[in-house]
């Protein structure tokens, strides 16, 4: 019972985030960060709680899984997991994104599988599109500097607009979650895993 309640809370949170993100609209003013009103936030949470209450244990468990697939098109296995196990999301890797038009179609197929079965909950479609050397969606998408170069300018607008346009490109493909930016600090010169993915060595510069 405790484990089920914990899963339910996680699903409520995920649904609230997905619903909030889908309603942010165009963000052209700089800097502007979406601040949901208390009434809107309360309504979304209540909607998520009603949805979770209607889920079977299989649906509830499936919502905490984020899976991937090999190749350019969704495998029969991933589509089965979406329809029958009601997984919460799919991770897009570079090997899924060699053709952007095909990727867009594939995401549409997976979202249709999710929204035409069970409780019709849309998927989180996630990727890693940090800019710099971490860019899983290539093709005609923008080539941007790494975070270290952006941080060196000390211009928040550079960081803002880089993130804005990366987000717009991902959104046009149907990707609604980006595991970015990296907020680790640049603490060691030989920290090769982070390196230029960090904005700065100062935590206050990285996240003022």
Kindly give the residue locations of the regions a language model identified.
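Signal peptide processing junction and immediate N-terminal pro/mature segment
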Residues: 25-37
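Bacterial N-terminal signal peptides
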Residues: 14-22
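Mature N-terminal segment immediately following signal peptide/propeptide cleavage
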Residues: 43-74, 83
């Amino acid at each position: 019972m405790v484990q089920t309640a914990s899963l339910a809370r996680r699903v409520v949170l995920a649904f609230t985030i997905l619903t909030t993100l889908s309603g942010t609209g165009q963000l052209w003013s700089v800097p502007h960060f979406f601040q949901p009103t208390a009434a809107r936030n309360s309504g979304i949470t209540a909607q998520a709680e009603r949805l979770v209450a209607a889920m079977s244990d299989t649906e509830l468990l499936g919502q905490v899984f984020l899976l991937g697939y090999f190749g350019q098109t969704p495998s029969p296995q991933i589509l089965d997991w979406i329809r029958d196990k009601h997984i919460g999301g799919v991770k897009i890797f570079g090997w899924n994104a060699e053709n952007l038009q095909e990727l867009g179609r594939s995401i549409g197929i997976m979202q249709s599988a999710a929204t035409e079965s069970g409780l019709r909950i849309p998927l989180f479609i996630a990727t890693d599109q940090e800019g710099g050397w971490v860019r899983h969606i290539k093709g005609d998408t923008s080539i941007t500097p790494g975070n270290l170069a952006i941080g060196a300018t000390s211009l928040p607008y550079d960081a803002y607009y880089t993130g804005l346009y990366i987000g717009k490109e991902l959104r046009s493909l149907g990707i609604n979650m980006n595991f970015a930016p990296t907020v680790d600090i640049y603490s060691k010169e030989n920290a090769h895993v982070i390196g230029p993915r960090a904005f700065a060595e100062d935590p206050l510069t990285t996240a003022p």
